[in-house]
């Protein structure tokens, strides 16, 4: 990027100046995990922009607020009070989901079923920056996902 010294401006490169890696760049050495960015650090880059840029944060928060709106409602408000054993309400979980959707374009939830598997007992938000997809199989199906807070450190 070319810098102009007088006002410390940066010129944004043209569309064609960007490097677009091939698909092999996004697989680990075993070929199972699809990387999120060339160094597998794209989510941390997005979070850094969100935390360091008030304009970026304002835009992301506006999208989040548009998704959340007035929050979740139901005729029996007590249903919304507890989503999991950590004491989070459904609206707490929904706000986290909306922020991940605004930042990353996706979200993840951990759903805990009862022992007899007849009802959902807990729902937890999973930080989307901790999630990576397994490589697609030959039929184009993603067989699973990996969750780790250490992805950007590898």
Language-model regions: role of each:
Residues 1-139:
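Flexible, gly/proline-biased loop segments at the beginnings
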Residues 142:
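Contiguous, non-catalytic segments that form substrate-binding/exosite surfaces or channel walls
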Residues 149-154:
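Intrinsically disordered, low-complexity linker/loop segments enriched in Gly/Pro
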């Amino acid at each position: 990027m070319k810098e102009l010294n007088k006002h410390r401006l940066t010129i944004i490169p043209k569309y064609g100046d960007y490097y677009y890696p091939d698909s092999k760049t996004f697989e680990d050495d075993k070929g199972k995990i699809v990387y999120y960015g060339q160094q597998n650090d794209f989510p941390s880059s997005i979070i850094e922009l969100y935390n360091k840029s008030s304009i970026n944060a304002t835009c992301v928060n506006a999208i989040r607020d548009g998704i959340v709106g007035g929050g979740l409602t139901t005729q029996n408000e007590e249903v919304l009070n507890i989503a999991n054993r950590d004491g989070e309400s459904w609206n707490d979980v929904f706000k986290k989901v909306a922020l991940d959707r605004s930042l990353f374009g996706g979200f993840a939830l951990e759903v805990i079923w009862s022992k007899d598997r007849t009802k959902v007992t807990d729902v937890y938000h999973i930080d989307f920056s901790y999630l990576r997809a397994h490589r697609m199989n030959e039929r184009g199906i993603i067989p699973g996902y990996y969750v780790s807070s250490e992805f950007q450190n590898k």
